């Protein structure tokens, strides 16, 4: 048996939409809105109860549960993360090369990982729909039952970038999710967010509650007590402009529920009239027809002083009707703003610390082809990531074509182009980046760039502390030795680090002779006028006119020699006899007995014991015979051998020789010993070097059994005002890198003399003259090169030798070229600074010139297939290689602050540069609530971002009004105040809209209206005020806060105008400057407010809610507001005329129409008086006529009674 289908006798009075799709939370929200609009709240709640029962029933029948297997990871996650890692590695390499600075690297890293996380989150919903549409996680989150997209993304996607407790983005992203598990490092980083959620839940909830209390306090007295205030002012809403600045779902919310302040016309047809409220249908019409601008009423311009009228407020947000009279709209507004902050602090417990933001919009190529555009319309620039690009300031037409199709693209203005003209692009390749239409939250922060090395700071161009243009800063590698004494070695000395001994106080015992007693000599041993006791045989005072120090000769076995300082000499003669003949102090003869392998060094202001082998005993090995003379030389004493036999020592040669095999990098400066002991002296400074240093290589056998390998270094002194604590750097072998220029070398240790006909080459060395050693050694090193000049062919040589020497040499610092027998036709181009090798029967090869002091980056190519393996400065140029002192380049951006000077010794971790840059503020509500509080309190450091270009364009339209108009200043003040109010509303809305929270603008406008309703009285001119003595001029004192409407009314009443300026009061200050002292005292500073109010004799009229609650009276809300509404005593004619006056448009604070209004009022008053007197006369006349009529009436009555009597008499 089938039942008859149900037929609706009375169909719906509207068209019912048919939903045949998955009901997610957005569709449900739309459906519920339609139900509320058509059926009301009661019927809608009944329908929703039925939907709830249906949903639970279906979930129970389907046995929906949630397990760990339901968490499905997106398949594209692997290659997305791999691509992001490769881009991160590329950015790291560019930073090491010095191509980008730290801010650009951090910015690119954040944007790359955020874009990866965002793409992964966007693919999550399509992946669930395609693979498992009935997945419980998918149904739960996308239906709105529990969980948001961000939380599900952390379960099955990736957590992404996290914020630390200070709000700074941690540059190490969390690549895992909760399904796959986190590594130990990722877990520790994610603990930031967990702790952040706990702290925010406990602490920030109290802050949000206090914010709600202050918001309610400032607007608690605002109640709807009137239907229409009669204002003609309003607010212009531009839908097209707002659509660019805010999201589309929030555009219509600025219109729905408002009341029009003027008629709206579309193509000459009026579709809406003044004082008509805007519903969904009318809002859609205005939006799609792009009517602009729309003039609506707002609480900003309501003429009511202590309340708000019904039409300026608009519809009630709970149901689609106009707000009822007696509604406490102030408390509703305060709670509407504060309550989302209280609720949203609880959200961070699950997603705390996750960085959120917007990704840039890219223009991609639709297909593979060749791209063409006008090169004259683009200009080179540098992107925010440090990459080269082009920028177009106007719209740019781009054409992409191939042999099959052609397509034209239009690039918006101020976009970045990443391609060149006539370049071949692939499909989906990013060709341009569109500038964001709305600027997100940004804050200026300082970024400190720290040194990664310990060393010395160099810069390429001279500059002050402020970097004026982008340049490189270099930190040359070196280690720091901190000492409490003045060092033995001076600037530019070369020393052996294991043998460098520094001590402040050294005893000279065991080195005594008869004349020298066992005394300890202090470091500051020879001061002016100080007696040196028991130093010589007889006490002697050194003269006062100079300071004295003592040098000692350094003794070697079987050798007597003294060393003097030379300039720019690599080979030093082992004997010098230069005398300084200023003042000689004769000394008695004495003998130093020095053990084998030991020596004594006496330096400036110090006494050192320089001991190679402290275990050796005192052995009489060599004597120095003859007297010594003490001479003055640069305020110091120098010991010279005076007398005795002088030895002639043969000339000694030294060479910097290096043998490389299979690209071995040798990290030291090699010095070879030839035949005799020698010293390496650098730039006129003292010597601290071992006498025997043989040529030794890593991985090679020693050529001499007596050779030993010691670490060499160069000392750079650090200027310091505090002489007690000096430091200097030691360049250890690890600070140098030797680059071998040839690809494949072989080392042959052959005992074979060179041919006699070989030409000996005298090459100018690094520090002086360098002699050839080819015929000096009994054995030589010969190198066989498989690849010479990196060509696969060997060089043809006419010589019949079995070995080949190096065919080419790099230039030294003097730019000199030497010709060899085995190499021909070497041409040097002084303009291109390149070395050309023109070999017979071969093509040319070009090498870049390297020179001493040149800075090289790691990214450069020193040959066709060899790339430089480290950045640094070239310090040594060999014949077939050069030595680089390792360094780290840092790119200093324009406007950065340099925290160090040229040549400063830096430790690892020292601040090198401080840069100021803008970073995105996190969109988390926890960072947003202080922003709301900052705006609401109108603090001085509040920065309101503006689109200046549009603001100036808007300003140009009003310049004609300002100039030549006496009232232009009043107009500008009014417009500035309105613009400030609108900006405050927009900034507060941005915080909540970023979290998807929808707050009506009228709530925020009520708050802003209260904090901008006071003005500050600036000055009262006593001399020109004629009414000063009768008290009118002293109505307001300078510095007094008065309501704007009150000042305007008093300004009309007084003959002298009141000077005032508009100010922004915060919530707290506005709550403490109200008409009710009971409300102020119950908020803050109770004793101070009550004492001040008692002294001023203030009266509280109990118009607000709070003061009535305190006193236990009826609050003026709902049915209790009628007792405060006073009936108008004006007659109908006067009220109509006053309504006509109120319709006059007023742009200048009603100043320009004041005379007209006063004259109209005076005429009106006189006319009313005349009409009143005329009415009085007519009334008296009417009274006389009435008395006359009464007499006639009484006479008629008497006649009537008389006639009745006659009639009765006739009847009888």
Swiss-Prot record:
Any one cellular-component term (Gene Ontology): DNA-directed RNA polymerase complex
The entry's keywords: Chloroplast, DNA-directed RNA polymerase, Metal-binding, Nucleotidyltransferase, Plastid, Transcription, Transferase, Zinc
Keyword Metal-binding attributed: yes
Start and end residues of each stretch annotated as Disordered: 1162-1212
Enzyme Commission number(s) from the entry: 2.7.7.6
One matching Pfam family: RNA_pol_Rpb1_5
Gene Ontology molecular functions: DNA binding; DNA-directed RNA polymerase activity; zinc ion binding
Reaction equations catalysed: RNA(n) + a ribonucleoside 5'-triphosphate = RNA(n+1) + diphosphate
Biological processes per GO annotation: DNA-templated transcription
Subcellular localization, as worded in the UniProt entry: Plastid, Chloroplast
Cofactor note text: Binds 1 Zn(2+) ion per subunit.
Residues binding Zn(2+): 229, 302, 309, 312
Cystine connections: none
Cofactor: Zn(2+)
Sequence similarity: Belongs to the RNA polymerase beta' chain family. RpoC2 subfamily.
Subunit relationships: In plastids the minimal PEP RNA polymerase catalytic core is composed of four subunits: alpha, beta, beta', and beta''. When a (nuclear-encoded) sigma factor is associated with the core the holoenzyme is formed, which can initiate transcription.
Known function: DNA-dependent RNA polymerase catalyzes the transcription of DNA into RNA using the four ribonucleoside triphosphates as substrates.
Protein name per its UniProtKB record: DNA-directed RNA polymerase subunit beta''
Lineage: Eukaryota, Viridiplantae, Streptophyta, Embryophyta, Tracheophyta
GN (gene name): rpoC2
